[in-house]
C-alpha cells in the first residue's frame, strides 16, 4: 500500500489544519477526529490525515495504489497551500 507524508512549517498551523479539514470534510466520504488528528476517507479509495504540532501541519496519505495516493496528495496539498496563500510553493511528499 503506497504511503507518503508532507510537512509545511507555517505560522498558526492549527488555523490552517482546521480550515483544510472543514473544507475537505464536505467532499469526503467520511471524516473523523481523535487525539488532534483528522482522518479523511475518500470515496475513490484511501485516507489522508491532517495533524499539527507547534510550528507545522503534517499531512499523510495512504491508498491502495499510486494513482489514488497522488490524488490524495493533490487534494490535501494544493488546498493547504491555497488556504495559506502559498500557491507558488510545493510540498515535498516522501
Positions of predicted regions on the chain:
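C-terminal structural segments of small proteins and small subunits
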Residues: 60-94
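Ser/Thr-rich, low-complexity intrinsically disordered terminal regions
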Residues: 26-47
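Charged, terminal alpha-helix-loop-beta segments
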Residues: 9-12, 32, 49-51, 78-81
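Amphipathic alpha-helical segments
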Residues: 13-25
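Terminal, regulation- and interaction-focused segments at domain boundaries
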Residues: 1-16
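Non-catalytic surface loops within mature trypsin-like serine protease
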Residues: 10-12, 44, 65
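A generic structural signal for beta-strand entry/edge sites
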Residues: 3, 35-39, 54-58
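Beta-strand/loop substructures that line and gate deep hydrophobic ligand-binding cavities in soluble
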Residues: 44, 48-63
Amino acid at each position: 500500500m503506497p504511503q507518503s507524508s508532507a510537512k509545511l512549517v507555517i505560522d498558526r498551523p492549527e488555523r490552517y489544519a482546521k480550515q483544510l479539514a472543514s473544507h475537505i470534510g464536505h467532499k469526503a466520504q467520511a471524516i473523523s477526529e481523535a487525539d488532534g488528528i483528522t482522518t479523511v476517507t475518500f470515496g475513490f479509495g484511501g485516507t489522508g490525515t491532517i495533524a499539527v504540532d507547534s510550528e507545522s501541519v503534517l499531512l499523510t496519505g495512504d491508498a491502495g495504489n499510486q494513482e489514488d495516493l497522488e490524488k490524495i496528495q493533490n487534494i490535501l496539498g494544493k488546498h493547504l497551500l491555497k488556504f495559506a496563500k502559498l500557491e507558488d510553493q510545493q510540498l515535498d511528499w516522501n
